[in-house]
Amino acid sequence: MRRAWILLTLGLVACVSAESRAELTSDKDMYLDNSSIEEASGVYPIDDDDYASASGSGADEDVESPELTTSRPLPKILLTSAAPKVETTTLNIQNKIPAQTKSPEETDKEKVHLSDSERKMDPAEEDTNVYTEKHSDSLFKRTEVLAAVIAGGVIGFLFAIFLILLLVYRMRKKDEGSYDLGERKPSSAAYQKAPTKEFYA
């Protein structure tokens, strides 16, 4: 039983140390020391253009509307008495997708306002209108995060109670003196007291 507890404890320590080691290595990978960049080998020059432009900035970008071209063969069936022939022609369809001029936040706001006004006008069709809402900015207002935090707290609390009960059990067992440490107590006959009388010649 004692071996099982030792193995369980070693397993838990290994898991915790592996997680902390993974967090430390990921932090080292994410942040670089600027002073060591000049000393490192194989360093490329810093391109300032990449830092000035960001995803979705749209200030210097030329927006091209993509043209989709699809071709489908259309069979022409001419009925003749001798042999049926199938001739195919190609139909070209060009679709132009207009470029979006509004930001996604503005379009989301418009959808929310439109759906609110539609809900006021026609309350019978509430279930058919589906739109997306932005999630709240606070992390603890989300139900799944709150449930995970509560579950983690309960598990941690139960583990702490288990450790305290184990400690109390071990202390009581130690007070009783029932530990078998694998050491044999020498019998009283093994060590006999030498006579304390001294003889002087």
From Swiss-Prot:
Residues 1-18 form the signal peptide. GO terms for cellular component: cell surface; collagen-containing extracellular matrix; endoplasmic reticulum lumen; Golgi lumen; lysosomal lumen; plasma membrane. It comes from the Eukaryota. It is found in: Membrane. Keywords: Differentiation, Glycoprotein, Heparan sulfate, Membrane, Neurogenesis, Phosphoprotein, Proteoglycan, Signal, Transmembrane, Transmembrane helix. It is a single-pass type I membrane protein. The keyword Phosphoprotein applies. O-glycosylated with core 1 or possibly core 8 glycans. Contains heparan sulfate. Also contains chondroitin sulfate. Residues 170-201 are cytoplasmic. Glycans are attached at S41, S55, S57, T101. The record marks R142, T143 as: Cleavage of ectodomain. Residues 19-144 are extracellular. Residues 42-70, 90-130, 178-201 are annotated as: Disordered. InterPro entries: Neurexin-like, Syndecan, Syndecan/Neurexin_dom, Syndecan_CS. Interacts (via cytoplasmic domain) with SARM1. Forms a complex with SDCBP and PDCD6IP. Cell surface proteoglycan which regulates dendritic arbor morphogenesis. Belongs to the syndecan proteoglycan family. This is Syndecan-2. The gene is SDC2.
